[in-house]
Every structure is written in C-alpha cells, then in structure tokens.
Swiss-Prot record:
The name this protein goes by in its record: Urease subunit gamma
Primary gene name: ureA
InterPro entries, alphabetized: Urease_gamma (IPR012010), Urease_gamma/gamma-beta_su (IPR002026), Urease_gamma_sf (IPR036463), Urease_subunit (IPR050069)
Organism: Synechococcus sp. (strain RCC307)
Reaction(s) the record says it catalyses: urea + 2 H2O + H(+) = hydrogencarbonate + 2 NH4(+)
Compartments (UniProt record): Cytoplasm
Family of this protein: Belongs to the urease gamma subunit family.
GO molecular function, one term: urease activity
Keyword Hydrolase: yes
Gene Ontology BP annotations: urea catabolic process
Length: 100
C-alpha cells in the first residue's frame, strides 16, 4: 500500500481519534491531542457522509463538552481546522470554540 504524506497524516488522526472514542466510552476525560483528533475525525466522517461545511461548523460545538475533557483543554482548543474531502472537492473546515 502506497500512501501520500497527507494520507498518512489523516491515518494518524484516525488512529488517535479511535483511541479517544474508546477512552470516552470508558468514562475517561480526553487530553488536548485526543480531543483535537476526536473533533478532526468527526469532520472527516461528516464530509464523507455528505454533510456541508456550514452544517459541520454549526454542529461541531456539540460533539464534545467540558465535562468530557481534562481541566483546561476546552480553553486550549479554541479552534480546530481540518481539510476534508467532500463530494464536490476538498475544503477546509474550521470549528471555533468547539468544546463548550
């Protein structure tokens, strides 16, 4: 299997996000890298499902709450940006203050 550097980066994000999902299921609070990976995967999967950029930006603040992350993580994650492939091309999705 031959992967481009961008594909390798996305695969790393997916791996970290799956670990974060498992930790959430066990009731553990996410740290900064886990929270960012989790949110990034939601963007990637939403784009793959055909959700629009505007819809992802609107719903993005509902994916994680303050009680699901370690103290201070919500303040550290002021913005998450992910380049995702939509049915009509690749677009940059930005979530502002995604953990509320």
């Amino acid at each position: 299997m031959h992967l481009s550097p961008q594909e390798k980066d996305k695969l790393l994000v997916v791996t970290a996000a799956l670990l974060a999902e498992r930790r959430l299921q066990r009731g553990l609070k996410l740290n900064h890298p886990e929270a960012v990976a989790f949110l990034s995967l939601q963007i990637l999967e939403g784009a793959r499902d055909g959700t629009t950029v505007a819809e992802l930006m609107q719903v993005g603040s509902t994916w994680l709450s303050r009680h699901q992350v370690m103290d201070g993580v919500a303040e550290l994650v002021s913005e998450v940006q992910m380049e995702a492939t939509f049915p009509d091309g690749t677009k940059l999705v930005t979530l502002h203050q995604p953990i509320r």
